Amino acid sequence: MFRARITLAVLLLSLIPISHSHAADVVYPGDRPFTLVVPTTYQSGTPAPLIIALHGYTADAPYADSYFALGKAADEKGILAVYPSGSRDSNGFLYWNATPACCNFDSSSVDDEAYLLSIIDSVSKDYSVDPARIYIIGHSNGGFMAHHMACKQSERIAAIVSLAGSTYSNTRSCKPSSPVSVLQIHGTKDAVISFTGGYLFGNAYPSARKTIDIWGQINECGKKPARVLPRLDLDRKIPGAETTVLRYKGCKAGTNSELWTIDKGVHSPELSATFADNVINFLLTHPKKSA
């Protein structure tokens, strides 16, 4: 078990950060501090969108910041961006307590759902946050946590983006009371969280396609998703527009369930310059509406 976890950690730590600068960083102190990036265009009294960016297993908040590289696009769109860190497990690795599959390997009782809600409440107290535009993006374990929040806190979360994560295998564990737009992004060559689904230490997680099918049913979408053009260029290491878009239509309350498949993409793709714009555009076009 320990050796398997170390192997997983080594795979996840192979990511290469991308550095960039911010407009203004505000650090919230406490037992679990987090960083809020305030856009240069922010005006008190004008409700702004809020995005929470979640790192993967073994990574941390600064890594999520540099890897997703949302800074420029978020600033241009007037988005408040939050970068929190998970808890440390017995091996010293940071993780989120999301679904049974990933990545609370110590069976800890840590409540990350409550922690993320407290972040939303704290930022909303100090800044003008639009309650209809609260979003989460996560990579790997962070993607699992994004799905968890969509399942358990659907009244607060408008939409999520999961890169190389997955939702609950047991659909009885995901019974949201409100529709949530879901974008699943996954590489076909992911060797950590398989595109076709699988198990982590005996706990199942659904495939990328099954994940959006589950949300298609939850959001009462049309029977079958359809491919949408144009293809996208999300991975700068793969030539051309390598990513196909599969989209459910006719979903409840203007929501969506989409799969962006990175052909030959790995667990931690080298994200292109257009990645941030594409995912932020998805989020902003899916605010929370009355069901």
Q: Where are each of the predicted segments found?
A:
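Primarily recognizes the serine-hydrolase "nucleophile elbow" in alpha/beta-hydrolase
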Residues: S124-S128, A132-V180, A191
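Serine-hydrolase catalytic machinery in alpha/beta-hydrolase-like enzymes
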Residues: V27-T41, G45-Y135, M145-H148, K152, ...
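C-terminal catalytic histidine-bearing segment of alpha/beta-hydrolase fold enzymes
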Residues: S181-I185, P206, I218-A291
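Bacterial N-terminal signal peptides
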Residues: T7-P17
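Acidic beta-to-alpha connecting loop that harbors the catalytic carboxylate
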Residues: G86, T188-A191, G198, D263-V266
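The conserved beta1-alpha1 loop
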Residues: I52-T58, A164, H186-G187, D263
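Boundary at the C-terminal end of the N-terminal hydrophobic targeting segment
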Residues: S21-A23
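Conserved alpha/beta-hydrolase "acid-adjacent" motif
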Residues: A191-T196, N203-S207, E270-S272
